[in-house]
């Protein structure tokens, strides 16, 4: 007994002594940990002077008196992880997540042999992943995510950690391939590897991790194909491989993953069909396939999955939306936007009682919106924008008692906006780009939840009522491009939450209400293109948060307010300020007068200033140079005087500077050479003098420079040749002297060069003639001499103007240099030569006149022969081939006449080639005349248009075509080769088009189906759009065709289309677009607005082109008896009626109907309907039309 007592006491004291030593060591380690921190005060409870045990300190947990857990997450601890932590021998959990630790993991940590949980996520740790992890055999949970680890995954990670059940290395900078040893982790259930730079294929050994439940590796660089062994993961519940360039199809073997609940393959560059085998995944709740290139229909087998979420946006899925969707009884979100689904929206969607989010935007859906859509009342967000939906929305959404967002933009919905929409809990209502008519219901403004209401590009009319002030929650109101009238109500000032107000392109009148200044949250105010009058209220421009102010195209008068928004006065550019509509100040096209306020120079965050086309006077304030963020400054079209401030060279971000059409004088500042970002510089039509600064050669980004119509002088600097991106250089009508620098031949991007009407001398540099991209060269009216170089553009009279240089010689100017070089030494010899020539001409003319009179007597009784004789009577008149003109950048230029008669062809050749304009050679009728086929000597076939005398507009048409076609060269425009004018006779010579007109093929050509198939029709649509887009946008001034129709689309031997017959075309100058009292166009193609206004626009051409697209897709004429029962009695009305009835497919030409081509045909129909919008402002421009057609 005594022995046992002694043994017990010995063991007790021995254990106590050991424990005391261990406890002292642990306390020391914890204190060392604290002291190593850069902010130790955050662990204030760790204090050895207190009576509390270290086991009671924050984050410390003990078992049997020893530390087994240290958990200090999200405390903002800073510093490096101290190696002393390895002294905590019994530690099983170490969690330092969500702090600010940096540096590497100390290797001593691997001495913690009992460690089961290691969480170092959310810090700034660096270095390679430590290979010594294999020294922790009991590790179950490892989280190193959200750090800065680099390098590859060491195979030892997977070989020596057999117990590991969760591994997270996501959001680091790891790279390389995944080693096949990953298959050794037989107990792993969670594997997170995303947001790294891993590459290669996922190893097939992944299938050996039999217990894996969650596998997430998004946002890496894995590629396909995916290993079929994934199907062996029978416990897999979540698979996320999104945002990887897999470039493969979805494996059919995924259908064997019966426990799969979440499948996320978003933006994985997937191709092929959605495999029907996915229907075997009976546990699948969330299927996310958006942003891929999947095609085909939705497989029926998906109907058997109890999905909560199905997203497949931005793919190429097609077919109709299946009615079996109604089987998804627990579906919460259905997102199928940006695909190619067609047909009607199935009413069975009402059978999805849990559906909250429905997005079917940007498809080819047609017909009316089914009233059953809101049958369950659960929908909270509906997006049907960008389809072909038609009909009205009366009572359609009455049952949507939970609806907070309704987006219907860019459809063909008509009728009025329902009165009862205000009863819904709507926060966003977007109705842009439809055919809504009538007034905006007053009841809508009673909505207390409405934060966004947009209805631009419709045909809404009426006025804005005072009740608008009741919509207190409204933040965004966009009603641009409608027909709203009246005054802007003062009550709009009550909308203190309003951030964006856009009423552009309406018919509002009166003054801008001062009360708008009470909308203190306004960031964007756009009242442009209305009929507003009066002065700009100071209270508006002083709005503290105003970032975009557009009041252009009104009748505003008075001076510019001197205290713009406080937002503009910020010292630094705020965040997001480079987004669209930030820092814009546009007051152009008004009647504002007085000086530009100096205070504008204090608005340091202004990005764009446009004050053009007003009546502003005085000098340009030097203070504008302080606007260091300015990218565009347009002060053109005013009455500004004085010199250009040299300080403007400080605006280093300036990309566009337009000071044209003012009265500025003095020199061009040398400091302009500092504007390294400048792309376009326009100083035309001022009174500038002096030389062009050599410093402009520093403008390496400049593409267009116009210094024309000034008094600039001196020699042209060779430094201009360093502007390597220059496309257009215009310096005509100045007083430049000296020679043209040959260094300009280094400007390989140059397309337009005009140095005409100066005092330049010397020879034409050969290098300039050989510029590879030069389309137009105007050297006319200088003092140039010598032989014209035989290279490139100088030998092309359609591209080079050389007239007015008397000492030039060579074939192209019709003067032989050798003959001209042999001087006649005797003045008597010259006089004798001239006298002899005169006698010869006199005798010839006298004889010809006698012969003609004799013939006229013989033919007096034959009208047809009299016509032939009259034509033959001027056979000595020359048929001149045109020299080209050029397009140019300034807003307005004078019409360029054709000063270079070349390659003379006798009219007799034309008369003979057409057999005296015989009826058998007629190939068509153009505007105001008949077109004949003619084969000239040399086997050149041309088309000759003989303008009719009976047409009172014949001379106008002739001049219009001359002015237009002589300046334009494009592969999709018919080239005008020559012309002749004698008395009342006028002839135009065009290139001959073998396949005639589109009109001929669509209606008269036998065997049309075999030849004019869908691919050719699409080719014709794209080519014709390309030609018309060039007329509208290829250069300034723009060109309106005014008579676009199928007979004016000609086809060459390869069915490449070319736009023809510019008989009604006219150049638009800066403010000229009115036609004569004669309505332009051809019946069936005339836009509706031409019957109400004398103003011709490019949007009128777009409408006519929309009719041509309809002809191509339907095979029908624009007018005819087939349309008697249709609205408007024409093809357009018939097509709209069919589409509104949900029968868009019936519009397609029956000869072309094909399941494979239906989507592209419906897409062309959709583009046509956009072009045919009744309101011009709703129509796209031709560049947008061309882009859309090319994407089919």
Swiss-Prot record:
The modification Phosphotyrosine is found at residues 990, 1085. The modification Phosphothreonine is found at residue 914. One of its GO terms (biological process) is protein autophosphorylation. It catalyses: L-seryl-[protein] + ATP = O-phospho-L-seryl-[protein] + ADP + H(+); L-threonyl-[protein] + ATP = O-phospho-L-threonyl-[protein] + ADP + H(+). It comes from the Eukaryota. LRR repeats lie at residues 64-87, 90-112, 114-137, 138-160, 163-185, 187-209, 235-257, 259-281, 283-304, 330-352, 354-376, 378-400, 402-425, 426-447, 449-471, 473-496, 497-520, 521-543, 545-567, 581-603, 605-628, 629-651, 653-675, 677-697, 701-723, 725-748, 749-772, 773-795. Residues 917-1192 form the Protein kinase domain. The chain crosses the membrane at residues 828-848. InterPro entries: Kinase-like_dom_sf (IPR011009), Leu-rich_rpt (IPR001611), Leu-rich_rpt_typical-subtyp (IPR003591), LRR_dom_sf (IPR032675), LRR_N_plant-typ (IPR013210), Prot_kinase_dom (IPR000719), Protein_kinase_ATP_BS (IPR017441), Ser-Thr/Tyr_kinase_cat_dom (IPR001245). Residues 1-18 form the signal peptide. Gene3D superfamilies: Phosphorylase Kinase, domain 1, Ribonuclease Inhibitor, Transferase(Phosphotransferase) domain 1. GO terms for molecular function: ATP binding; protein serine kinase activity; protein serine/threonine kinase activity; transmembrane receptor protein kinase activity. It is found in: Cell membrane. It holds the Pfam family LRR_1. ATP binds at residues 923-931, 945. PROSITE patterns: PROTEIN_KINASE_ATP (PS00107), PROTEIN_KINASE_DOM (PS50011), PROTEIN_KINASE_ST (PS00108). It is a single-pass type I membrane protein. Glycans are attached at residues 47, 171, 187, 208, 259, 414, 435, 555, 629, 682, 711, 746. Present in young buds, open flowers and siliques but absent from mature leaves and roots. Strongly expressed in the young organ primordia, and as the anthers and ovules developed, became focused in the microsporangia and in the distal and chalazal regions of the ovule. In cv. Landsberg erecta, only expressed in the anthers of young floral buds. The active site is at residue 1043. Belongs to the protein kinase superfamily. Ser/Thr protein kinase family. Receptor with a serine/threonine-protein kinase activity required for the specification of the correct number of male archesporial initials and for the subsequent specification of tapetal and middle cell layer identities. In seeds, required for enhancing cell size and the rate of embryonic development. Some ecotypic variation may occur: in cv. Landsberg erecta, meiocytes of a null mutant fail to undergo cytokinesis while in cv. C24, cytokinesis clearly takes place, with the mutant meiocytes degenerating shortly after the tetrad stage. This is Leucine-rich repeat receptor protein kinase EMS1. The lineage of its organism: Eukaryota, Viridiplantae, Streptophyta, Embryophyta, Tracheophyta.
């Amino acid at each position: 007994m005594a022995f046992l007592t002694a043994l017990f006491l010995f063991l007790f004291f021995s254990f106590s002594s050991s424990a005391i030593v261990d406890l002292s060591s642990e306390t020391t380690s914890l204190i060392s940990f604290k002291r190593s921190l850069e902010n130790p005060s955050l662990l204030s409870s760790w204090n050895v002077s207190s009576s509390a045990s270290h086991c009671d300190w924050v984050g410390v947990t003990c078992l049997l008196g020893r530390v087994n857990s240290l958990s200090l997450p999200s405390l903002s601890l800073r510093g490096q992880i101290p190696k002393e932590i390895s002294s905590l021998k019994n530690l099983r959990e170490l969690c330092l997540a969500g702090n600010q630790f940096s540096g590497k993991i100390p290797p001593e940590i691997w001495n913690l042999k009992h460690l089961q949980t290691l969480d170092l996520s959310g810090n700034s740790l660096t270095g390679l992943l430590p290979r010594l992890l294999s020294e922790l055999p009991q590790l179950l949970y490892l989280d190193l995510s959200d750090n800065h680890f680099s390098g590859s995954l060491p195979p030892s990670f997977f070989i020596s950690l057999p117990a590991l059940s969760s591994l997270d290395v996501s959001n680091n900078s790891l790279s390389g391939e995944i080693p096949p040893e990953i298959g050794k982790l037989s107990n792993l259930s969670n594997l997170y590897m995303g947001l790294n730079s891993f590459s290669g294929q996922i190893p097939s050994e992944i299938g050996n991790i039999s217990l894996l439940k969650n596998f997430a590796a998004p946002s890496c660089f894995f590629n396909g194909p995916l290993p079929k062994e994934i199907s062996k993961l029978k416990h897999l519940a979540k698979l996320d491989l999104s945002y990887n360039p897999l470039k493969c199809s979805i494996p059919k073997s995924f259908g064997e993953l019966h426990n799969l609940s979440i499948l996320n393959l978003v933006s994985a560059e997937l191709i092929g069909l959605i495999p029907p085998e996915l229907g075997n995944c009976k546990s699948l709740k969330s299927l996310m396939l958006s942003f891929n290139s999947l095609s085909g229909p939705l497989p029926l087998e998906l109907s058997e999955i109890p999905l909560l979420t199905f997203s497949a946006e931005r793919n190429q899925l097609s077919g109709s939306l299946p009615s079996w969707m109604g089987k998804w009884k627990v579906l919460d979100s259905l997102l199928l936007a940006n695909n190619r689904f067609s047909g009607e929206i199935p009413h069975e969607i009402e059978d999805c009682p849990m559906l909250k989010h429905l997005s079917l935007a940007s498809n080819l859906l047609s017909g009316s919106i089914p009233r059953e859509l809101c049958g369950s009342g659960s929908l909270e967000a509906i997006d049907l924008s960008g389809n072909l939906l038609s009909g009205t929305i009366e009572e359609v959404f009455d049952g949507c008692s939970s609806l907070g967002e309704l987006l219907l933009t860019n459809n063909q919905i008509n009728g009025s906006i329902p009165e009862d929409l205000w009863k819904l809990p709507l926060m966003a209502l977007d109705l842009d780009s439809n055919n809504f008519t009538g007034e905006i219901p007053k009841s809508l403004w009673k909505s207390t939840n409405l934060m966004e209401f947009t209805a631009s590009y419709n045909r809404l009319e009426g006025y804005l009522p005072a009740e608008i002030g009741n919509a207190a929650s409204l933040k965004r109101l966009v009603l641009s491009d409608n027909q709203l009238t009246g005054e802007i109500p003062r009550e709009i000032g009550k909308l203190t939450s309003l951030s964006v107000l856009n009423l552009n392109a309406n018919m509002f009148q009166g003054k801008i209400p001062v009360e708008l200044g009470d909308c203190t949250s306004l960031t964007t105010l756009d009242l442009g293109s209305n009929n507003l009058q009066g002065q700009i209220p100071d209270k508006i421009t002083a709005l503290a948060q105003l970032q975009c102010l557009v009041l252009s195209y009104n009748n505003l008068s008075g001076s510019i307010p001197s205290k713009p928004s406080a937002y503009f006065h910020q010292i630094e550019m705020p965040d997001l300020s480079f987004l669209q509509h930030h820092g814009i100040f546009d007051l152009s096209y008004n009647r504002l007068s007085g000086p530009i306020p100096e205070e504008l120079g204090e608005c340091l965050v202004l990005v764009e200033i446009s004050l053009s086309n007003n009546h502003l006077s005085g000098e340009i304030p030097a203070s504008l140079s302080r606007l260091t963020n300015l990218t565009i400054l347009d002060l053109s079209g005013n009455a500004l005087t004085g010199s250009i401030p040299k300080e403007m060279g400080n605006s280093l971000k300036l990309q566009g500077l337009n000071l044209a059409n003012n009265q500025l004088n003095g020199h061009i500042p040398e400091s302009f050479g500092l504007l390294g970002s400048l792309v376009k510089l326009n100083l035309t039509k001022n009174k500038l003098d002096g030389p062009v600064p050599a410093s402009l050669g520093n403008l390496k980004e400049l593409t267009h420079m116009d210094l024309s119509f000034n008094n600039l002088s001196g020699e042209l600097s060779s430094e201009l040749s360093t502007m390597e991106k220059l496309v257009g250089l215009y310096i005509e009508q100045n007083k430049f002297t000296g020679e043209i620098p040959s260094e300009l031949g280094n400007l390989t991007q140059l397309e337009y060069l005009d140095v005409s009407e100066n005092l330049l001398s010397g020879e034409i540099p050969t290098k300039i003639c050989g510029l590879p991209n030069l389309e137009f060269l105007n050297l006319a009216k200088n003092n140039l001499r010598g032989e014209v170089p035989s290279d490139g553009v100088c030998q092309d009279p359609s591209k080079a103007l050389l007239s007015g240089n008397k000492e030039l010689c060579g074939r192209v100017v019709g003067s032989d240099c050798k003959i001209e070089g042999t001087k006649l030494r005797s003045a008597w010899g010259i006089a004798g030569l001239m006298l002899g020539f005169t006698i010869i001409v006199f005798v010839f003319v006298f004889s010809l006149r006698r012969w003609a009179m004799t013939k006229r007597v013989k033919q007096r009784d034959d009208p047809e022969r009299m016509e032939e004789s009259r034509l033959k009577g001027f056979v000595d008149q020359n048929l001149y081939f045109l020299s080209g003109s050029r397009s140019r950048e300034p807003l307005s230029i004078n019409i360029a006449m054709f000063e270079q008669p070349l390659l003379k062809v006798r009219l007799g050749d034309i008369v003979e080639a057409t057999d005296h304009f015989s009826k058998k050679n007629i190939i068509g009728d153009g505007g105001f005349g008949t077109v004949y086929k003619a084969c000239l000597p040399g086997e050149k076939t041309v088309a000759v248009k003989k303008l009719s005398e009976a047409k009172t507009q014949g001379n106008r048409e002739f001049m219009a075509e001359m002015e237009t076609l002589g300046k334009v060269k494009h592969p999709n425009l018919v080239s005008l080769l020559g012309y002749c004018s004698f008395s009342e006779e006028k002839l135009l010579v065009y290139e001959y088009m073998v396949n005639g007109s589109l009109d001929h093929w669509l209606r008269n050509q036998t065997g049309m189906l075999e030849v004019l198939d869908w691919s050719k029709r699409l080719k014709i649509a794209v080519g014709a759009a390309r030609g018309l887009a060039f007329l509208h946008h290829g250069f300034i001034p723009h060109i309106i065709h005014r008579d676009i129709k199928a007979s004016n689309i000609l086809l060459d031997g390869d069915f490449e289309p070319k736009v023809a017959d510019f008989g009604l075309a006219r150049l638009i100058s800066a403010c000229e677009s009115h036609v004569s009292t004669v309505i332009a166009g051809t019946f069936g193609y005339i836009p509706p607005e031409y019957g109400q206004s004398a103003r011709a626009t490019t949007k009128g051409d777009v409408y006519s082109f929309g009719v041509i697209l309809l002809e191509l897709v339907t095979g029908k004429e624009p007018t005819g008896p087939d349309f008697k029962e249709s609205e408007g009695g024409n093809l357009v009305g018939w097509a709209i009626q069919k589409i509104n009835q949900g029968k868009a497919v019936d519009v397609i030409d029956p000869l072309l109907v094909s399941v494979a081509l239906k989507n592209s045909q419906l897409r062309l129909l959709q583009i046509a309907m956009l072009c045919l919008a009744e309101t011009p402002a709703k129509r796209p421009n031709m560049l947008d039309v061309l882009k859309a057609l090319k994407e089919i």
